[in-house]
Amino acid sequence: MSETVQKQGRVVEIDSHAINFGPQHPAAHGVLRLVLELDGEVVERADPHIGLLHRGTEKLIEYKSYLQALPYFDRLDYVSPMCEEHAFALATEKLLGITAPERAQWIRTMFAEITRILNHLLNLTTYALDGGAMTPVLWGHEEREKLLEFHEAVSGARFHANYFRPGGVAKDLPAGLTDRIADWTEKFPAFIDDMAGLLSDNRIWKQRVVDIGRMTPEQALAWGFSGPCIRASGIPWDLRKSQPYDKYADVDFEVPVGRNGDCYDRYLVRVEEMRQSVRIVKQCLGKIRPGPIKVQDHKITPPPRAEMKRSMEALIHHFKLYTEGYHVPEGATYTAVESPKGEFGVYLVSDGSNRPYRCKIRPTGFAHLQAIDVMAHRHMLADAVVIIGSLDLVFGEVDR
């Protein structure tokens, strides 16, 4: 935008100026490069440049077996890895025509919700930091550490878990873990109340986020929003309710919905989602029963170590599984899960071989990021920071 000013008999042309926001900026949440066209401090245009974390994940998966492809999903949205694995595991199960055992489904549902809380803890606390509040991020990391210990207990890894598998989960829950999780579910709601008490009615926080980056329900649908971002705009769309998978049909929970579609509502929706996730985890703990944790077809899941020491067939199954992998019948499926950020989908095509013919990943943040021009228009430069924070972007999945 340029304007003409008449000054002392001269006509002076004043042009807007463009600046780079990121990719080195700490509030860019990774490697976002945002070219902002400013009129003074007012954002006239926001042009996101992506691809700085592109690793060719979709193409790499075409050269791996289905089992080898799974760990790539941990590295997409590396803040909520088990939810990404969940989508690929369900898609592969659909093509194979198998269903994970009851116990495995309850474990996966429980850890998907633990992962949701992990994600929201990081987002809400760093989002508050973007707005100038330093205390929540110090509190939040202490709580996240407890949840990462649960990740480590079942998978051996804090972040890149590689725990969900087509047909179930990699290992059973270690002894005593359910008691530790149950103890944590009793204490964690008090932390949510403390954090919400620090921010929800804080006058300074509300000045930063209320009526900033508003999206109407029509705009949210048009831009392909999902997850907390679309629910903050007043649309109660949640795949766990509308298209339940694993054990979500057997648990009771509410879908929090906002009214104004602004940064404040996106914050409130995530706070309430953490409360609902604790509620789901409690129900999972009460309903998990003893049983197998993976399908008993050893052409798909590895046989137990003890059986391999006794049976030649078990040894052959293990060797074939880890050298060649299993062959998936020809077909295609689109399978989506309600990840902490929104709808994370996998379009998986099999040509009957042991490798995916095509694996198209539908990232959540990609749709949200493209709307930033609309959301930041005519807001101040400082508001662009909280808008980015409210979208909960992770560039591992945006760039793939």
From Swiss-Prot:
Q: What is this enzyme's catalytic activity, as reactions?
A: a quinone + NADH + 5 H(+)(in) = a quinol + NAD(+) + 4 H(+)(out)
Q: Name one GO cellular component term.
A: plasma membrane
Note the InterPro entries from the entry.
NADH_Q_OxRdtase_suD, NADH_UbQ_OxRdtase_49kDa_CS, NDH1_su_D/H, NiFe-Hase_large
Q: What GO MF annotations does this protein's record show?
A: NAD binding; NADH:ubiquinone reductase (non-electrogenic) activity; quinone binding
Q: What is its main location?
A: membrane
Pfam families in alphabetical order: Complex1_49kDa
| Compartments where located | Cell inner membrane
Q: In what way does this protein cross or attach to the membrane?
A: Peripheral membrane protein
- Highest taxon, organism lineage: Bacteria
Q: Does the keyword Chloroplast apply?
A: no
Alphabetical list of Gene3D superfamilies matching this protein:
Cytochrome-c3 Hydrogenase, chain B
Which EC number(s) does UniProt give? 7.1.1.-
Disulfide linkages recorded for this protein, renumbered to the chain, are none
Q: How does it assemble?
A: NDH-1 is composed of 14 different subunits. Subunits NuoB, C, D, E, F, and G constitute the peripheral sector of the complex.
Q: What does this protein do?
A: NDH-1 shuttles electrons from NADH, via FMN and iron-sulfur (Fe-S) centers, to quinones in the respiratory chain. The immediate electron acceptor for the enzyme in this species is believed to be ubiquinone. Couples the redox reaction to proton translocation (for every two electrons transferred, four hydrogen ions are translocated across the cytoplasmic membrane), and thus conserves the redox energy in a proton gradient.
Among PANTHER family, the record links this protein to:
NADH DEHYDROGENASE [UBIQUINONE] IRON-SULFUR PROTEIN 2, MITOCHONDRIAL, NADH-UBIQUINONE OXIDOREDUCTASE 49 KDA SUBUNIT
Family membership, please give it: Belongs to the complex I 49 kDa subunit family.
Please give the name of this protein. NADH-quinone oxidoreductase subunit D
Q: Which organism is it from?
A: Granulibacter bethesdensis (strain ATCC BAA-1260 / CGDNIH1)
Gene this protein is translated from? nuoD
